[in-house]
Structure formats: structure tokens, C-alpha cells
């Protein structure tokens, strides 16, 4: 089997801006998350593995909320004089998937049109329990993306519990072997 050498971080940084690096990862992770969400059996959306766990539908809604959070952080910032809140979850996974995809496209467009100097501007966000701090926008962008990856991991466990087929994420799964 042939392998190709990946460029070193220094080589990448010389040709790809931090904004472009983020967008490439953002698109790749979005495509993977969409595969996982679409694989979930619609008739099992209320699956709740534990009393303290969210239902699958509520967990999927986090992806939509985070796109709104990211768009707001990059365009307007937050008004912390009002308690944070989100809209209630959509009634079904199909709507959630559609809203997540729409939100992703809006955020990708915002990021694509940002200048690199805007990435170091800060946004007020939580840095510890009940503690706000200034976070560079680029760091906030990566934090949200990493949080989505975390929730996708949770959702993939729900998917297995719902007897769905877990698609490849970073490698083969029992349902999608690579060899």
C-alpha cells in the first residue's frame, strides 16, 4: 500500500493562513458530522441512555446552537447582561440536520470573508465557571469545533445504542471497515 508524506506544520503555515487552516478542518469535520447525524434512526430520536443524559434529539440540537453561537461571536459578540439561552430543539432530526447545515454554511461564509487580522480580535466568553475572559476569535473558533467533535463522539455512542450503523469518522468502524 502506497503512502504519501504529509506536509510539516511549518510547510503548511508557509502556504496556508490560520483562517484557511480552520476552514479546511471546519469543512472536513462538518461532512463527517453530517454522516453521523444522517445515520441516526429517526424513530429513535428520543433515546436517552441515562436520566442525566440528553435525548438524541436534544444532543443533536447542540450542533445547531453552536453554529449560532459561533456566528454571533464572529459577527456581533455576546451581550452577557442577559442570561444565555437557546431556542428549544426542533421537533425532529431531519429539521435539526437541515438547520445545522444552514448554520454551518453561514459560519463558513463569515470566516471565508474575514481578514486574518480579525482572527486575533477578542470575544468575551467563559474561561472558567462563572468567569468571563477575552478569547481571540481564532481560539474560540477552534474551541467550538473541538466541542462539536466531542459531541459527535457522544452522538456516535447514541447511534450504536440505537442500532444504527456508525460511519467512518477517523478510521474504520464495525459498520464501515476500510480493508
What residue ranges belong to the model's regions?
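Short, contiguous alpha-helical
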Residues: 2-5, 9, 23-27, 31-37, ...
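Short, low-complexity N-terminal intrinsically disordered segments enriched in polar/charged residues
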Residues: 10-20
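Soluble or luminal CAZymes and related metallo-dependent hydrolases
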Residues: 18, 25-29, 99-103
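Active-site rim elements
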Residues: 18-23, 90-97, 141-145
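Short, solvent-exposed, charged loop/turn and helix-capping segments
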Residues: 40-43, 116-117
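Helix-adjacent hinge/juxtasegments
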Residues: 72-115
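Acidic catalytic patch
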Residues: 113-128
Amino acid at each position: 500500500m502506497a503512502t504519501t508524506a504529509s506536509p510539516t506544520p511549518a510547510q503548511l503555515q508557509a502556504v496556508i493562513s490560520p483562517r484557511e487552516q480552520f476552514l479546511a478542518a471546519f469543512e472536513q469535520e462538518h461532512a463527517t458530522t453530517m454522516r453521523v447525524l444522517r445515520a441516526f434512526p429517526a424513530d429513535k430520536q428520543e433515546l436517552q441512555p441515562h436520566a442525566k443524559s440528553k435525548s438524541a434529539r436534544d444532543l443533536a440540537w447542540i450542533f445547531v446552537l453552536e453554529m449560532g453561537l459561533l456566528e454571533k461571536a464572529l459577527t456581533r459578540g455576546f451581550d452577557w447582561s442577559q442570561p444565555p439561552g437557546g431556542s428549544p430543539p426542533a421537533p425532529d432530526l431531519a429539521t435539526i440536520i437541515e438547520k445545522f447545515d444552514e448554520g454551518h454554511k453561514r459560519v463558513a461564509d463569515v470566516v471565508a470573508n474575514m481578514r486574518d487580522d480579525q482572527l486575533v480580535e477578542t470575544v468575551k466568553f467563559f474561561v472558567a465557571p462563572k468567569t468571563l475572559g477575552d478569547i481571540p476569535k481564532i481560539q474560540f473558533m477552534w474551541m467550538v469545533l473541538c466541542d462539536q467533535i466531542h459531541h459527535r463522539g457522544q452522538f456516535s455512542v447514541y447511534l450504536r445504542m440505537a442500532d444504527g450503523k456508525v460511519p467512518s469518522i477517523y478510521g474504520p468502524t464495525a459498520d464501515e471497515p476500510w480493508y
